[in-house]
Amino acid sequence: MAASIRSVIAMINPQFKSFIDQEILPQTNLGVEKFWQDFSFLINEFSPQNRKLLEHRAYLQKQIDAWHISNRSRPIDMGNYTKFLEDIGYIVPEGLHFKIETTNVDSEVATIAGPQLVVPLKNARFALNAANARWGSLYDALYGSNVVPETDSLKAGAGYNPLRGQEVINYGRQLLDQSVPLANGSHRDVISYKIHRQALLVTLADNSQTTLSNSSYLVAFTGDEDSPSAVLLKHNGLHIEVLINREGAIGKTDLAGVNDIVLEAATTTIMDCEDSVAAVDADDKIEVYRNWLGLMCGTLSVEFPRNGKTVSRRLNPDKIYTAINGGDYQSAGRSLLFNRNVGLLMESSMMTDADGKPVPEHIIDGVLTALVSMIDLNRRLNDGSGYNNSKAGSIYIVKPKMHGPKEVSFVCQLFDAIEKMLGLAPNTMKLGIM
């Protein structure tokens, strides 16, 4: 194990300290000495509280184990069992009803209902794939899955199967008819899409013209109004992008020149430091934090071989269109990223507290997640690069395996202290309770 060095009153793994001092702190307005002093004070304030909570967990578990042993030969009476759990304090009285108002919450949390992914943050390639899963080809997803049945004539096979491809196209048109229907006719019979007087002008195979049944479905486009390369539609808060290219592999055989339909998909992603990750030492954990740093800075990239070629992965930029009423229409190119810290149980040898005991790892996770995310918040205000995570100015942390309101209250107090330590506005850190 690497030798540790002393900073104020906590012992710190030197590689971990060097990573923070050299790669993270220079991108913030925090001084090295002050940061480590405040970090040490925070550890020594919250580590003992964390241990007491875990001792209470152990006490409860011991009581529960004893109850099950003593009642192993009897059928479980749920009424008696519930009363027992209430008596020992495992089930606590329900609190009073309350209302809260949370500010600076991104639309992906507040108003958009969309899929959420969970990926191990230690794997940069998986993390990038998930972050970029905000948008995905419907055609690719259908062709490569059993949503389109693989009957004899529709098998995918080694090469392109045009019969299967046509079933994919039919499915796509059906989705358009369901989500963004026309005033008359079907998207299946469209031969051209144009933008005319801030509306979608649609020509059908019989040369009749129609438009969308609801004009609000159309929000933006790219290319010329008479021959757009993309038409951006919106249904229930989620975008549908119809890509038009009459020279494309699919578009050249399509009546309307539609080359693909791209759906807004994973609106949020949990970058996981917990269950899906095997981070057992300082080197592993530094890799996890370094990937989070790359995501928050917009610089994370990875290269890997595929079919004899080198493939690169990096974060997708935001998507820019022409709004129907003029000007730019910008849509997020990436999932809104949450960070799932470890739970209260885990300890880390990267740091020790004033008593020489390993520090609860979730405290380190909380500080490092917020510290790195500060870079994203500062870039949001200053550089306009388009790679911001939270456009509302928040940090989203999922805290797993919490046992009851006392532990939730403890984490809220910890987040308050982290915000104060880092100079963040109160409630910048948003807590996801698991």
Residue ranges and their predicted role:
Residues 2, 82-83, 87-410, 416-425, ...:
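Catalytic alpha/beta active-site cores
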